[in-house]
Swiss-Prot record:
This is Uncharacterized protein MJ1180. It is found in: Membrane. Keywords: Membrane, Transmembrane, Transmembrane helix. Its main location: membrane.
Length: 145
């Protein structure tokens, strides 16, 4: 359980970092668009979204819901530092990378293969962290027992 909180804290911290990189001319704070695939691997995003008080108290950063599962406000302490738009993409990681290439997505939660493929083709993207590391190991252990 402690690992998931640390991963979520890292996720929110990465949003804080990106908040300074994206500008929206119509508001005082930037708007970040975060795309994800609807899998259990990206549940950490919604752990952060659904537990703002926990993360505010423990880490000083939190997401507050404006429209559940779609729009949030990112706070550092009591200061709003970004608007966060959450976009569910059901067509796979390549679709997310297409959106990123088009400038429609700022942060993405997806597997490595499409990221590596698009970076190899020239897309300006960086992997900043793993959100899960042990799921494959558990599956393989069960398959080969």
């Amino acid at each position: 359980m402690k690992k998931i909180y640390m991963l979520v804290a890292l996720l929110i911290s990465s949003l804080v970092l990106f908040a300074g990189c994206v500008q929206n001319e119509t508001s005082e704070v930037p708007t970040l668009t975060v795309a994800y695939l609807p899998t259990d691997h990206h549940a950490s995003l919604f752990v952060a979204c659904d537990n703002p008080d926990l993360f505010k108290d423990k880490y000083g950063i939190c997401l507050k819901a404006v429209k559940d599962k779609e729009e949030y406000e990112l706070y550092k302490g009591n200061k709003k530092i970004a608007n966060v738009k959450v976009v569910k993409v059901t067509e796979g990681g390549a679709s997310i990378m297409n959106l990123m290439t088009q400038g429609q997505v700022d942060v993405a939660l997806l597997g490595y293969p499409p990221v590596i493929f698009y970076i190899d083709k020239g897309t300006k993207a960086k992997v900043i962290m793993n959100l899960h590391t042990e799921v494959l190991q558990l599956l393989l252990e069960r398959i080969f027992q």
